[in-house]
């Protein structure tokens, strides 16, 4: 398990960031088996020590591609569980999410699937499995209202997916969420955040690398990327540690 969020400053030089950003590699059931297997096989390659601290990939984001069907997604979840990494289950289909949690719940995954239309059912699943629930929405107002509704239902074990339709929107989301929590003391936005760079720069690994660096500073608790080999890890893990 990893501790996320808990930050008290907007800028690192004001004090420090207390809980470092965690990186996740994205897998999707929409991928072919060869691609999935190759990406999973590459995960252990990044594992080294820097200044007495282990540097390795901590998480896997397991995305549900509805067009591939539930069965393939559940098989992918099984493969991801076998890696021993912490999982983020990116699935907003309640029935598929329920089945995925049955497979993965022992490892305490994050269920990133709540939105304005399904949050009640997703909340029930997350509370039953005792896992963190991820909240997304069409815009910040919708996310805010959904988080408030979940809090009213008694769930504060949440994480906010700040990923928007564009880089500009995502950056604004991340900054506004942090500022609302710290400057305005609005605890409805006082949760860790997920930023998915694989959605912001589709199949552009160089842009994704730049965006991972950006959202390490601005204010991703979990940042998702398509791949994180040794060459990509070196320029990210050093600044994150510093």
Where are these predicted regions, by residue range?
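Active-site beta->alpha loop and helix N-cap motifs at the rims of alpha/beta catalytic domains
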Residues: 2-145
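Catalytic alpha/beta core domains of metabolic enzymes, predominantly
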Residues: 117-242
